[in-house]
Amino acid sequence: MSLPLLECKYVTEEFVREGKNGNYGTKLPSSVPMLRFLYELSWILVRGELPIQSCKAVLEGVEFLDKPSREELASCFADVVTQIAQDLTMSGDQRSRLIKLAKWLVESQTVPQRLFQERCEEEFLWEADMVKIKAQDLKGKEVRLNTRLLYQQTKFNLLREESEGYAKLATLLCRGSASSSHNASAATMGIIKSLIGHFDLDPNRVFDIVLDCFELEQDYDTFLNLIPIFPKSHASQILGFKFQYYQRLEVNSPVPVGLYKLTALLVKEEFINLESIYAHLLPKDEEVFEDYNVSSAKRFEEANKIGKINLAATGKDLMEDEKQGDVTVDLFAALDMESEAVTERLPELENNQTLGLLNGFLSVDDWYHANILFERLAPLNPVAHDQICSGLFRLIEKSITHSYRIARQTRFQSSSSASTVKLTPTANTTANRTYLDLPKEVFQMLVTVGPYLYRNTQLLQKICRVLRAYYLSALDLVRDGSNQEGSAYEVSRGHLKEVRLRVEEALGTCLLPSLQLVPANPAVGHEIWEVMSLLPYEARYRLYGEWEKDDEQNPLLLAARQVAKLDTRRILKRLAKENLKQLGRMVAKLAHANPMTVLRTIVNQIEAYRDMIAPVVDAFKYLTQLEYDILEYVVIERLAQSGRDKLKDDGINLSDWLQSLASFWGHLCKKYPSMELRGLFQYLVNQLKRGQGIELVLLQELVQQMANVQYTENLTEDQLDAMAGSETLRYHATSFGMMRNNKALIKSSNRLRDSLLPNDEPKLAIPLLLLIAQHRSLVVVNADAPYIKMVTEQFDRCHGILLQYVDFLSSAVSPTTAYARLVPSLDELVHTYHLEAEVAFLVFRPVMRLFKCRRNGDVSWPLDSGESMDADSEISESESSMILDVGTSEKAVTWSDVLDTVRTMLPSKAWNSLSPDLYATFWGLTLYDLHVPRNRYESEISKQHTALKTLEEVADNSSSAITKRKKEKERIQESLDRLTGELKKHEEHVASVRRRLSREKDTWLSSCPDTLKINMEFLQRCIFPRCTFSMADSVYCAMFVNMLHSLGTPFFNTVNHIDVLICKTLQPMICCCTEYEVGRLGRFLFETLKIAYHWKSKESVYEHECGNMPGFAVYYRYPNSQRVTFGQFVKVHWKWSGRITRLLIQCLESNEYMEIRNALIMLTKISGVFPVTRKTGINLEKRATKIKNDEREDLKVLATGVGAALSARKPHWVTDEEFSMGFLELKAPPVHTPKHASSQNGLLVGVSQGEPTGERATVNQQPESGGLGKDQMLKTKPLDGRTESIPSKSDQGHLKSKGGNPLDSQPSISKKSMEQKETDETPRISDENPVKPASKYSEAELKASSKRGASVNKSAKQDFGKDDGKSGKAIGRTSTADKDLNYLESRQSGLTKALSSTAANGSIATGSSKVKDDGAEALDAQKQSSRTVHSPRHEIVTSVRSSDRLQKRANAVEDSERISKRRKGDAEHKEHDSEPRSSDRDRSVEARLDLNKTVTDDQSTHRDQDRSKDKGYERQDRDHRERVDRSDKPRGDDVEKARDKSLERHGRERSVEKGLDKGTTRSYDRNKDERNKDDRSKLRHSEASLEKSHPDDHFHSQGLPPPPPLPPNIIPHSMAAKEDLERRAGGARHSQRLSPRHEEREKRRSEENLSVSVDDAKRRRDDDIRDRKRDDRETITVKGEEREREREREREREKSLPLKEDFEASKRRKLKREQQVPSAEPGEYSPMPHHSSLSTSMGPSSYEGRERKSSSMIQHGGYLEEPSIRLLGKEASSKMARRDPDPIAKSKSKNSNFLDIALESMTVNGKTTRGEQSGSGEIGSRE
């Protein structure tokens, strides 16, 4: 019968209809009862009205009334399904749906399968596949199981057992231990067996009773003998039943301790197995571990909260928490937290039977099984329980009792023996020694107990002492084994290694963590350090690192660390000088307990706050040695910590944290001797090996603080002067407030030395030194910096540390012999360790002073031995006789060995200009050897006397004050005596060194084959490396050069040395130096200039110190040749001033940061002596003021300092006239040129005569041997732009018209024109050279040439006016030729003088070429244009003077018109100039490359040039006749005829010009390839000069329009028509002289010109102005034709070469015959062979490729800018009489060749101007 249909109240038809539509999530209107809804839903699903899968959606959408849980829902669903499954009337489809529903409920995890298995019938479970057994079988199995569990009874057989038997058994077992012997045990065993048999007792019951009795009396050994009679398998079961009894819920009593102990004893006796009994214990391990992890996480969370700031706290609460007066430290806070945690875990020990069994094992001393349980229960941390920890402590102490007794006896014996006389150990004492050994179980126990050993500090100290004795015993065993066989020694070493590992393990896992929990017990820390100190620092640091990691794994240690960190921060907030004592002790208490955390926190605070260093260092006086060691580890750890930048964002300065850390470490190590430094030094060594040297700042601070050895770049003048003094003087100057007898300083210095040079450790002093030196060499290459500014900063920092470290080593390692034994040899330093020469000598220099003579062992190098030896054998014998005395038995090192090493340090070609003796002497000496700072000695002695006087005036007469004063007086008197004695000793030392150097000087450079390169090599190899090494070395270099000069060292030219320094090498050195190096270089330049200005101050000073010195010889190879005169020296000073000004301005106007900064630093360093002139100072001050507005702050600061320095020097600035001292005529006076000088000396005279005047900007006239060529070498075009374009732009509004000069009034002067004129200014000043004519010329000749010189000099003045780009003021300068001539004229009555017309022409060209090369110095001289400086020696004849004035006025108009015309032509025909200029430029380049061509090759060119010379002479004759004829005609006719004649010559001579010019150029082009090949090395010096030859295309000398003809009475007679034409066409290159046969006519013309009045000159000037304007317009039409002729001339040049050679050869021979007599004039300098092609390529470095055999007597002209210095006969002969005349005699044979070349170079194509300038360049460059 089926059940009626169910009435659904909740799962209604509407609900079903919505479900069929797929809307299963329809919410019911209200909550429904769960059971009713599930029942209705199940029936709906069974009937199939809804699909089974919709059940989940329906359940999710329904809301039940009672909100049941998931388990309750599953249970109700299972009940519903079970109820429906019992319906027998259900159809098959419905039942299948029901089964399907049940499966779905299980699969969807809605109902667990276990619930269906419990409640459903077997058949339903089988159908639903919920059981694997059939329904019938499952029913049978169920019946059997129920029967066995419910109806089977336990049999106890109580009827057969009698209580009497058990009573007798209990009596037998409880008799006590009186009969506990072996026989008694056997008898007891027999009785028990009898009782079991007689009373039929259950053996298991008997065994149980035996165990119970054993539990009560565990000391009764009889029970142990009774147990074996029972089966072992039963024992574990019986004990298991006992433990299970206490696991019952109804039993509330804990397990008896006796039961744990009984079980542990049975397990220990191996009667039962631990695993068999462990299975009966509860709770299970997994459950316990899970509970412990929850509680441990809670404790970790609480520990991490310690010290965190509560952001929700109000300000008032925070103030209450941080009251100033409430600074307290709770040392037990962490322990209180631990006690609370242990109290919470106390029930765990009662309920956990495993922990009870572990405690039982410890109670029976069974460590083996206890260790097994410890390892198994490690996640539970069982040691935290006091009972287990106490049992472990007892077991540890029992294990070490015997060892502790031995250790105590050994310690007592060692302490007692130390107080008595030390006995020699014997074999018996060694044999009786007891070696301590500890079992490995002790170390296992220590690892297990971990940090909880803090609970028993007494045991902790015992363990420390035992471990120390244990380790020392192993060390003794190794020492004893070292005297035995190899196998025994290896065994002892293996044992030591094992002992060390065990001790380290005990320290890391137990002792150090325990210290962290001991509240402020320094004794414990001391005991631990006694063990730690036996280990090397590497092992200690590893333990400290592991210690920190262990803290994070234990909540107890973490809490202690957090509390210590919080307390430390609170103390540091209040730490100050006032409360230092109180808070310092509190810091120490915290550090005693938690040193790692406290010290790390303090270091972190110091990195952030530098002002905390001093109070913290003072507070650390209470720390123990262990804490000091941990502090060093913390510092190294902070250094090595990754992720922190050690440089600031600018990449230059060190980070604040690193600077603070280094300063802190230096102060700490200085104050506390307990600090160990070996670890830090090893870290620095390792970092240097990796190429990282930033951390060297720590070494710098250590040396500075501990040894008071400081390195500073900004020494005062007094300090720098004292650096040359004795040790006492240096100490007083650089002690920085430290007392000499400061005991603390001495101790700290010795500690630092001992740390670097320990007795038993690797000595790191020398490895650290070598690594620093190598890092210095590589820092520039390997520096990871984007800007060179950062690289230089790193280099300077490393270099400073190197100097400081070497200074410390040399002073700390005493005596010097110990230092010599310590450092490697010079050969090893250079070749093995690859140190640079300057660094190697820095290290080896103290060792060089140990070289002593074999014969006189008391005298060491560099003192004079006092022995007299002949000059030939002196040096060689001294080399072999000096040996190195280091006090060892090693092979003696001789001085010759050092020289052999020195020879390998430089390339072989360097020794052609240097000698090893000079090189070794230079690098071996110091400032102390050369200079006695007497003023500093006297000043310091005066200070000491003042201090004594001050002490005597003290009125305090107390006993303590008197005692203190007495000690102070003794100290001062000691310093006085020492200073006085050292002053005398120093003077004797310098005198002795000077005697030795005086003996050796003659051999230093005499054997050098290439004397031309001496100064360059000396600068490159010696001066520059050392003068940039340190500030004292920069002074030393200047002193050494002065010493070379004062000693009269042969072949060392002092003037050329300064010239090469300033003109060739100074600018590149400024650009490539670092910040500190350029400061040192500036100091060297300051000292050099100071000496030079001292020589310039007075002529008497100059004559006394320089006048007769080889250093001022004109010829390199002949030291006894003529000397540079005082006038020439003043002129070269002008050149040097201009060069320095120009290069400084170029750098200041550069876009490169380094150049600007270095120039400012250089200017700051030399501001004491430079600038000298007011103009130069103003120019430099303007540049500095401009830089003050720069956005870069460091440049602003430097510029401000420079401005202040210049302002301070303003009162000392002088005018140009005062600077020139009358030797530089800044306004052109009459020029007197001797004809003979012109004809013989050729180029040489032309240069000197031409330099003060200037007509056109001849671009190629740049020849400075010493410096001008170098000036132009260095990036000429950028130099022009930077140097002069800016000033001319800024001051272009200041152009003014002055003196009625029509040139100055023209506003159309272009910028390029000014640049061109500035470029051409240098030779006008620096090339001035006094020319002394021969006595054979007449007065008439002098007068004739003076007229021409006057006109030319007037041109120079106006040319200067045009060149001035700033103020537009005309500048006039006068050649010193006429000054020296007139000076000598006053001394030598009757001496005839004359100046050639060639010289006058040369002056026109060279004067204007000086502007640009003088740079800013030209600007300095502009305001002096209207003033003429006259030498006091100038006495000019009245008639000559009046004539000169007339000609100067005429020349001014002439030059003005010519320049104006040229400027117009360039402006109109600019587009047509490129081709002619390029062709001429090519010829100029080819001419410059023709430097080293031999005389034979040159003569082929001379033959071509002779033709043009004769042509020029013929034209000169013709012009002269025409001018004489015109002189008597009216002025108007003269002007017209002169103009017509000039135009006629211009048209007529162009045809001749083409053939001659091309033929001459052909000779130059022929060997161009060979010359290029030879001069390739020189082009690097001359290429810039080539570029500079065309700084501006508008004023290119080859492309200028031809000037109009001059009036007849103004045109210089030396300028032929063709020369004038070619110069205007752009081909003017060389100077041309008059032929000797025209001398008489020239004399007459000169006399006639003297009679011209001033009115005539004015009239002619006005006429000339009008004529030139007209000529200017007419010339424009001719200019185009001239350019076409220039192109044709280039094409026809090669064709005309053969004809020119024949013609030139004949003319050259004729000229040679005419010039033979004056060429050998005594007392004059022989000119050098040169030709026109040597215009400028012989400038900077021409001497490098010049062989001695290819030049006779080479004049040093670079520093004079005028290669030939000619003396008048009387003076020259008098000087030559005092010197060796052989050099002059040797040159006579070659004078004819010199003359040929000079004449040819002057007359090639009639290009007079270029030839004279070429002479200047060539002669100067050959030096």
From Swiss-Prot:
Q: Per the record's keyword annotation, is Coiled coil included, yes or no?
A: yes
> Pro residues bias: where?
1600-1610
Biased amino acid composition, Polar residues: 1394-1409, 1802-1816
Provide the phenotype resulting from gene inactivation: Embryonic lethality when homozygous.
Q: Where is the composition biased (Basic and acidic residues)?
A: 1272-1283, 1312-1330, 1356-1367, 1432-1596, 1616-1625, 1636-1648, 1655-1706, 1768-1785
Any one GO MF annotation of this record: RNA binding
Q: Please state where this protein is localized.
A: Nucleus
Q: Which processes are annotated in GO (biological process)?
A: miRNA processing; miRNA transport; mRNA export from nucleus; mRNA processing; RNA splicing
**From the record, which residues define motif Nuclear localization signal?**
964-969
InterPro entries recorded: Tho2, THO_THOC2_C, THO_THOC2_N, THOC2_N
Q: Out of the domains of life, which is the source?
A: Eukaryota
Q: Where is this region: Disordered?
A: 1244-1382, 1394-1823
Question: What is the annotated role of this protein in its UniProt record?
Answer: Acts as a component of the THO subcomplex of the TREX complex which is thought to couple mRNA transcription, processing and nuclear export.
Give the quaternary structure.
Answer: Component of the THO complex, which is composed of THO1, THO2, THO3, THO5, THO6 and THO7.
Q: Family per UniProt?
A: Belongs to the THOC2 family.
List the protein's name: THO complex subunit 2
Q: Which organism is it from?
A: Arabidopsis thaliana
Question: What lineage does the source organism belong to?
Answer: Eukaryota, Viridiplantae, Streptophyta, Embryophyta, Tracheophyta
Q: Source gene? A: THO2
